[in-house]
């Protein structure tokens, strides 16, 4: 069983704690992406990054000195978005790190795919960015089916905790033999169930933590998730979609 998760824009360097285990599997293709980005002007990159002048300047300077092989941080500690804050890997025990290394895969526009203990550096790039490298018109074409092939294992079970921007990298290549389960977090707004971005990100991280702490191998066990006020709605769920509703007090 594999769990897929989106990356986060906010990243840090932490070389004082856990050391990375290895480099991301597609580091050579990452080097191609980096070279392509270095060939662009600051204004071109600002348009790609969709950011203000200050953030563009910061990332442009970082890009010029970027080293894919030194001063690396384990991916699960490098990303600092909401999902990773609620996953709280910094307080994991060894068993949880081992579980995540075997089961969690973080999808990335820059690296393609990373294991939790792969060494990464801070970068800014989203999968839907207008980036054409070689014959590829965009990053979805650039990474092709490589992400899917890295995620699928003998169990053929994938738990989708990623956003649509990233999960579509996998969904395009699914086969009838695969069991792909999307996790939906929602709450009642008026008379409708809606997904609220911040709460969904919190829940995704909390669920990764729950799965790791309970060493889950059977997807049915995920239905027991009951943190942050969420509970499983069997009446709204299916084999391909597990729906969790947050009760608002």
Regions inferred by a protein language model and the residue ranges of each:
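Short hydrophobic beta-strand segments
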Residues: 2-6, 157-160
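Active-site helix-to-loop segments that bind/position phosphate- or nucleotide-bearing substrates
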Residues: 4-91
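Internal, well-folded beta-alpha domain core
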Residues: 88-239, 243-249
């Amino acid at each position: 069983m594999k769990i897929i998760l989106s990356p986060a824009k906010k990243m840090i360097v932490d070389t004082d704690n856990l050391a990375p285990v290895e480099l991301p599997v597609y580091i050579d293709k990452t080097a191609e992406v980096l070279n392509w980005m270095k060939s662009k002007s600051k204004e071109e990159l600002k348009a790609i990054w969709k950011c203000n002048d200050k953030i563009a300047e910061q990332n442009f300077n970082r890009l010029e000195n970027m080293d894919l092989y030194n001063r690396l941080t384990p991916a699960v500690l490098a990303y600092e978005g909401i999902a990773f804050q609620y996953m709280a890997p910094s307080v994991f025990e060894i068993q949880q790190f081992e579980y995540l290394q075997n089961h969690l895969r973080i999808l990335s526009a820059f690296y393609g795919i990373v294991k939790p203990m792969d060494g990464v550096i801070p970068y800014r790039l989203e999968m839907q960015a207008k980036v054409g490298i070689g014959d590829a018109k965009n990053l979805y074409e650039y990474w092709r089916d490589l992400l899917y092939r890295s995620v699928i294992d003998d169990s053929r079970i994938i738990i989708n905790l990623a956003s649509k921007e990233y999960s579509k990298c996998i969904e395009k290549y699914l086969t009838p033999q695969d069991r792909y389960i999307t996790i939906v977090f929602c709450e009642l707004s008026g008379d409708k169930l809606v997904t609220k971005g911040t709460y969904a990100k919190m829940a995704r991280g909390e669920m990764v933590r729950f799965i790791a702490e309970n060493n889950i191998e059977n997807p049915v066990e995920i239905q027991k998730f009951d943190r942050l006020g969420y509970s499983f709605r069997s009446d709204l769920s299916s084999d391909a979609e597990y729906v969790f509703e947050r009760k608002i007090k």
